[in-house]
């Protein structure tokens, strides 16, 4: 379906009490306006005209990778004026969809319904019924058809009783919309050029106006303050959780789950409360994620358990692994099948081989660790000299004792043993035992220091 979109995003958002443009505030980890852009892109919009004003530099920096036409509205003179700034780019025969950068939850299904409903030469308008319509423009009908929209400040007492309200979202043909916009005036209580006045203009020409309701009323809720944004966040997360439950994912507490990206799950996955998913995350079959974990841009294979309060970012975890509790896997971390990393272990840019373990209090950075190797508690790969980073290579079946420092670059061959407390600075041959502890001494009659009076 051939259409272009105009996204209005020029408002300041005074009630947000923020230095950032309102539409850049995030919902599910993504700027509100980015949700709208992504929806239009997914539907195949030919052009996306983004009307911006306040905080223009921030807008263009944050959305630098988006394929949009940047349309400046230097003076905010109303919604009609905003759309008119983009009108020189409209093709006469294309559908023009008007959306809002602070209405982030509008769904592809609702937009498709609206595009399909546009009568030839007329307007399709998205409306919704509200028990409390205060503050919204009212839909005026005459014997059924929509004939006008009256804003709250211009409405009579009788019109204020109407519960059907305008969402501002509409579709019209480019040539018609340009003509109607050119005829707008600002003779109203706000002194603004209302986009809603094109409804009356279309009616005066005998054009049909078709009203369509959204699939879900929450889709058309806008954001004016942080309380509204928080409410939409919870609504969005509830919808995401419901989809995952329907797909077979066991969310132990759907009300305490946040998805801020994309999640792919295999069969029989279980996610406990207060888990946060960011970026692109993939879980295999029978994966268990404990409470309080944060997963970002990572892949976790079948039958792996991630125990509570672990953070995994930019990492790959194999099958049958155990992670945590309180583990941090940083970008470049790779755990092969049946690897174990436990509490207060940090791994960065390192591969831990099949069946190997680092169960306690360990930092492994810029390292390659072979199979069936045991890394004792308190082991540190000393990979950074203040200017450059160096690699530690540990072979198969190696035992590294507790409280060891491995000063890179260093290689430990297969089957070697590193005694507890060792500071290793040289390579170790296959099967060797290395120990660098200071010889133990016993001092009899030693007196512990006392505080001076």
Swiss-Prot record:
Co-factor requirement: Mg(2+)
Assembly description: Homotrimer.
Highest taxon above the source species: Bacteria
SUPFAM superfamilies the record matches: Nucleotide-diphospho-sugar transferases (SSF53448), Trimeric LpxA-like enzymes (SSF51161)
Gene Ontology annotations for the cellular component aspect, listed alphabetically: cytoplasm; membrane
Family per similarity comment: In the N-terminal section; belongs to the N-acetylglucosamine-1-phosphate uridyltransferase family.
Pfam families: Hexapep, NTP_transf_3
Active site residues per record: 360
Amino acids binding acetyl-CoA: 377, 383-384, 402, 420, 437
Cited function: Catalyzes the last two sequential reactions in the de novo biosynthetic pathway for UDP-N-acetylglucosamine (UDP-GlcNAc). The C-terminal domain catalyzes the transfer of acetyl group from acetyl coenzyme A to glucosamine-1-phosphate (GlcN-1-P) to produce N-acetylglucosamine-1-phosphate (GlcNAc-1-P), which is converted into UDP-GlcNAc by the transfer of uridine 5-monophosphate (from uridine 5-triphosphate), a reaction catalyzed by the N-terminal domain.
Record-level GO BP terms: cell morphogenesis; cell wall organization; lipid A biosynthetic process; peptidoglycan biosynthetic process; regulation of cell shape; UDP-N-acetylglucosamine biosynthetic process
UniProt-recorded name of the protein: Bifunctional protein GlmU
Name of the gene encoding the protein in the UniProt record: glmU
A molecular function GO annotation: UDP-N-acetylglucosamine diphosphorylase activity
Region (N-acetyltransferase): 248-453
Annotated binding of Mg(2+), by residue: 102, 224
Region described as Pyrophosphorylase: 1-226
Reaction it catalyzes: alpha-D-glucosamine 1-phosphate + acetyl-CoA = N-acetyl-alpha-D-glucosamine 1-phosphate + CoA + H(+); N-acetyl-alpha-D-glucosamine 1-phosphate + UTP + H(+) = UDP-N-acetyl-alpha-D-glucosamine + diphosphate
Keywords linked to the UniProt accession: Acyltransferase, Cell shape, Cell wall biogenesis/degradation, Cytoplasm, Magnesium, Metal-binding, Multifunctional enzyme, Nucleotidyltransferase, Peptidoglycan synthesis, Repeat, Transferase
Cited Gene3D superfamilies: Hexapeptide repeat proteins (2.160.10.10), Spore Coat Polysaccharide Biosynthesis Protein SpsA, Chain A (3.90.550.10)
């Amino acid at each position: 379906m051939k259409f272009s979109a105009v996204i209005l995003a020029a408002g300041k958002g005074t009630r947000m009490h923020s230095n950032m443009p309102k539409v850049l505030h995030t919902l599910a980890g993504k700027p509100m306006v980015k949700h709208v852009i992504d929806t239009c892109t997914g539907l195949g919009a030919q052009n996306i005209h983004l009307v911006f004003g306040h905080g223009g530099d921030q807008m263009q920096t944050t959305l630098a990778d988006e394929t949009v036409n940047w349309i400046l509205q230097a003076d905010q003179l109303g919604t009609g004026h905003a759309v008119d700034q983009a009108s020189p780019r409209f093709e006469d025969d294309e559908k023009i969809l008007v959306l809002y950068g602070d209405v982030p939850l509008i769904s592809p299904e609702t937009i498709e319904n609206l595009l399909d409903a546009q009568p030839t030469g007329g307007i399709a308008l998205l409306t919704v019924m509200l028990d409390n319509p205060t503050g919204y423009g009212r839909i005026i009908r005459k014997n059924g058809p929509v004939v006008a929209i009256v804003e709250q400040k211009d409405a009579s007492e009788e019109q204020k009783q109407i519960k059907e309200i305008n969402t501002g979202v509409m579709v019209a043909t480019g040539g018609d919309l340009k003509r109607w916009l050119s005829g707008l005036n600002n003779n109203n209580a706000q002194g603004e050029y209302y986009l809603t006045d094109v409804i009356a203009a279309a009616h005066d020409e005998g054009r049909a106006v078709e009203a369509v309701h959204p699939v879900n009323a929450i889709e058309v809720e806008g954001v004016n303050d942080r309380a509204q944004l928080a409410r939409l966040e919870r609504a969005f997360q509830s919808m995401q959780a419901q989809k995952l439950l329907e797909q077979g994912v066991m969310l132990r507490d759907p009300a305490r789950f946040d998805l801020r990206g994309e999640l792919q799950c295999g069969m029989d996955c279980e996610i406990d409360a207060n888990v946060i998913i960011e970026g692109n995350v993939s879980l295999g079959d029978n994966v268990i994620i404990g409470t309080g974990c944060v997963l970002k841009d990572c892949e976790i294979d079948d039958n792996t358990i991630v125990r509570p309060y672990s953070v995994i970012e930019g990492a790959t975890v194999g099958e049958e692994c155990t992670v945590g509790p309180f583990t941090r896997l940083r970008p470049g971390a790779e755990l092969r099948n049946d690897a174990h990393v436990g509490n207060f272990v940090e791994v960065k840019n390192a591969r831990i081989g099949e069946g190997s373990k680092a169960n306690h209090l360990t930092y492994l950075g810029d390292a390659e660790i072979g199979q069936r190797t045991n890394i004792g508690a308190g082991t540190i790969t000393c990979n950074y000299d203040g200017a450059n980073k160096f690699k530690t290579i540990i072979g198969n079946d190696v035992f590294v004792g507790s409280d060891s420092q491995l000063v890179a670059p260093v290689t430990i061959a297969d089957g070697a043993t590193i005694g507890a407390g060792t500071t290793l600075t040289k390579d170790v041959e296959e099967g060797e035992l290395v120990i660098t502890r200071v010889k133990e001494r016993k001092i009899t009659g030693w007196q512990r220091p006392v505080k001076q009076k």
